[in-house]
Amino acid sequence: MSAQRIRIKLRSYDHRLLDQSAKRIVEVAKRTGAKVAGPIPLPTDRRVYCVTRSPHIDKDSREHFEIKMHKRLIDIIDPTQETVSNLMSLELPAGVDIHLKL
């Protein structure tokens, strides 16, 4: 019989905020007696936008902007009911996107 597991994927533009949130989730899970694998850093998505500097002429003059999406993965193995309720009541910053998979 396979063990029950909760997979949490965190995404954010700010890596410091992301690491703090991952640390809080791991602390809550360990405090309630569940086994934790992670946080595992996933590849960073990098999006580059190319914009012309002038609105009229000179197409050769362009500017590049980039935005990076940092990601982490946390697996909680054999979670108890207390673990699930504590994770649901956990307050995390607004800049962190969370996806849960049971």
Curated annotation (Swiss-Prot):
SMART domains: Ribosomal_S10 (SM01403). Coiled coil: none annotated. This is Small ribosomal subunit protein uS10. GO terms for molecular function: structural constituent of ribosome; tRNA binding. The keyword tRNA-binding does not apply. Part of the 30S ribosomal subunit. Involved in the binding of tRNA to the ribosomes. The keyword Isomerase does not apply. The gene is rpsJ. The lineage of its organism: Bacteria, Pseudomonadati, Coprothermobacterota, Coprothermobacteria, Coprothermobacterales. GO terms for biological process: translation. It comes from the Bacteria. PANTHER family: 30S RIBOSOMAL PROTEIN S10 FAMILY MEMBER. Belongs to the universal ribosomal protein uS10 family. GO terms for cellular component: ribonucleoprotein complex; ribosome. Keywords: Ribonucleoprotein, Ribosomal protein.
